[in-house]
Amino acid sequence: MSKSLQKPTILNVETVARSRLFTVESVDLEFSNGVRRVYERMRPTNREAVMIVPIVDDHLILIREYAVGTESYELGFSKGLIDPGESVYEAANRELKEEVGFGANDLTFLKKLSMAPSYFSSKMNIVVAQDLYPESLEGDEPEPLPQVRWPLAHMMDLLEDPDFNEARNVSALFLVREWLKGQGRV
């Protein structure tokens, strides 16, 4: 953060709506110039998530998973919450086993992303998984997740697939491409 910027003062935080999964807060702010505003946000949970980009035999492994927000099956990388006490790498390996049926001997952290930071505090850790071995764990998915193997040589063609459009997946694709370029693999 720029040292010349002063964060606004939080004057009040109030819960304005609650459901089984979400809590919406109203946040009264005063900026350093004296201007006051009321914003709304999802209550911070202080839990992060992980997105895993598995690579095997020069292919990416993606899954198709139902997204109720878009009411469609989305093509993307495996992801899930980091459980309390888990490291990013432990969560990545667990989610990979639950959703893809593989574990990884080689996990590489690429970047931590935020999504809609004006409304959410959540962070997504992007991890590449390599040197895979078959291993499954029971997950919390309501149905099996079909896998799609996509050749690394054509990875950017994913951008043309109408089911591959979620922003974190697109970001992960670009991050992985740059990481692979740095290794001389694409």
UniProtKB/Swiss-Prot annotation:
GO CC annotation: cytosol
Residues that bind a divalent metal cation: E95, E99
Catalytic activity from the UniProt record: ADP-D-ribose + H2O = D-ribose 5-phosphate + AMP + 2 H(+)
The protein's Enzyme Commission number: 3.6.1.-
Metal-binding is among the record's keywords: yes
Cofactor binding annotation: Mg(2+). Other divalent cations can also be used.
Binding site for substrate: E40, S118
Gene Ontology MF terms: ADP-ribose diphosphatase activity; ADP-sugar diphosphatase activity; magnesium ion binding; protein homodimerization activity
Domain of life: Bacteria
The keyword Magnesium appears for this protein: yes
Chain span(s) of sequence motif Nudix box: 80-101
CDD domains: NUDIX_ADPRase_NudE
Residue ranges constituting the Nudix hydrolase domain according to the UniProt record: 45-172
Cofactor section: Mg(2+)
PROSITE patterns noted in UniProt: NUDIX, NUDIX_BOX
Swiss-Prot/TrEMBL GO biological process terms: nucleoside phosphate metabolic process; ribose phosphate metabolic process
Keywords: Hydrolase, Magnesium, Metal-binding
SUPFAM superfamilies from the UniProt entry: Nudix
InterPro entries cross-referenced by the UniProt entry: NUDIX_hydrolase-like_dom_sf, NUDIX_hydrolase_CS, NUDIX_hydrolase_dom
Pfam family for this entry, one: NUDIX
EC class name: hydrolase
Similarity comment: Belongs to the Nudix hydrolase family.
Cited function: Active on adenosine(5')triphospho(5')adenosine (Ap3A), ADP-ribose, NADH, adenosine(5')diphospho(5')adenosine (Ap2A).
Self-association state and partner proteins as the record states: Homodimer.
Protein name, entry field: ADP compounds hydrolase NudE
Source lineage: Bacteria, Pseudomonadati, Pseudomonadota, Gammaproteobacteria, Enterobacterales
